[in-house]
A protein has these predicted regions:
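Short beta-strand elements of ligand-binding domains
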Residues: 118-121, 146-153, 252, 277-281
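Active-site phosphate/pyrophosphate- and oxyanion-stabilizing loops and adjacent acidic/basic residues
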Residues: 39, 83, 105, 137, ...
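Extended, non-globular alpha-helical segments
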Residues: 2-16, 135-155
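Small/aliphatic-rich secondary-structure junction motif
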Residues: 11-69, 91-94, 160-208, 213-227, ...
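A short acidic, glycine-rich active-site loop
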Residues: 69-77
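Acidic (E/D-rich), amphipathic helical modules within compact regulatory domains
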Residues: 36, 44, 50-51, 66-67, ...
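Glycine-rich, Arg-bearing micro-motifs that act as flexible, cationic patches
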Residues: 119-141, 161, 248-272, 282-285
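Structural beta-alpha unit
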Residues: 1-19, 73, 84-117, 124, ...
Length: 285
């Protein structure tokens, strides 16, 4: 099937009431994962939200040496397909073509004017979308707004955001991540699994975990939905997502701390997880 083939048929649960993310930028390049980003962003925004469908052609050179990442004819097809997805979900949208380059810089600058950036997730190998790879790498260094790296779920699995894996490092700022997840769960009727993974052995449970369990309330269906794992955080998150059939991972990206180890956790999870990943940077202090 071509990259513009039909998206899988999934139950769609639009946001109820005021969406958590109302103004979403979707970067589309014609790949199936970028169209999945439009669909998942539309589910988050709902009819009361708005999608900006952005195709960056990254035009360089002039005359015989003029090149573009996406041809004019291809851009029209890509945006028409993306608009059809938004219309099916009854989500208002605008289509925008930006000839600027490099594409990653253009997308990240435009994302600052939105609540969320949605795009196709990068491939686990080098055989992937250059757009997704470039934007993800840049965003992990300077994430200004939350970023949703999207993957299409296999048929028969939970629909998008139906089952959320929340990865909490229990550090300062993680309570805000819990609050965001609680709002998402309330808007979409989601169940939540709370995961704390650390490679440092301890005989005590992090005090903040108990507080976060209370904050999540009935989004946690039972005690088994709270997991404490002694393992590499990236490996634990990817494995827990597989074991629990999560359809969305929510986690932080601590680029403000300048810790390469933390950044690598985000990068590995975005590349290796089977489902979409919502990355949120801690607030500026």
């Amino acid at each position: 099937m071509s990259d513009t083939g039909a998206l899988q048929s999934q139950p769609v649960r639009p946001a109820s009431g005021k969406p958590v993310f109302a103004n979403i930028l979707c970067a589309v390049d014609g790949t199936r994962k970028s169209f999945a980003a439009v669909e998942q962003a539309g589910i988050l925004a709902g009819p009361e939200g708005h999608l900006t469908l952005l195709a960056v052609t990254a035009v360089t050179g002039s005359g015989a040496y003029r090149t573009a990442a996406i041809s004019p004819a291809r851009v029209e097809q890509v945006l028409e397909r993306a608009t059809q997805i938004a219309e099916r979900l009854e989500v208002p949208s605008d289509a925008v073509v930006d000839p600027g380059a490099p594409a990653a810089r253009v997308i990240l600058e435009r994302a600052r004017e939105h609540d969320l950036l949605a795009l196709g997730a990068p491939a686990a190998s080098w055989l992937g979308s250059k757009l997704a790879d470039g934007v993800t790498a840049a965003a992990l260094k300077e994430l200004a707004v939350p970023m949703l790296a999207c993957r299409r779920l296999p048929p028969g699995e939970h629909s998008f955001a139906e089952r959320i894996l929340l990865a909490s490092d229990c550090l300062e700022g993680s309570d805000e991540l819990v609050g965001l997840t609680r709002r998402l769960a309330a808007a979409h009727g989601s169940s939540v699994i709370l995961l704390h993974a650390t490679d440092v052995e301890s005989s005590t449970r992090p005090p903040r975990i108990s507080e976060q369990v209370d904050a999540l309330g009935d989004a946690l269906k039972d005690a088994a939905d709270v997991r404490i794992e002694l393992d590499s955080p990236a490996e634990a998150i990817v494995q827990a997502a597989d074991e629990t059939d999560a359809s969305l991972i929510v986690m932080g990206s601590r680029r403000h701390k300048g810790l390469r180890a933390i950044g690598s956790v985000s990068r590995r999870v975005v590349r290796e997880a089977h489902c979409s990943v919502l990355l949120v940077a801690p607030a500026e202090t």
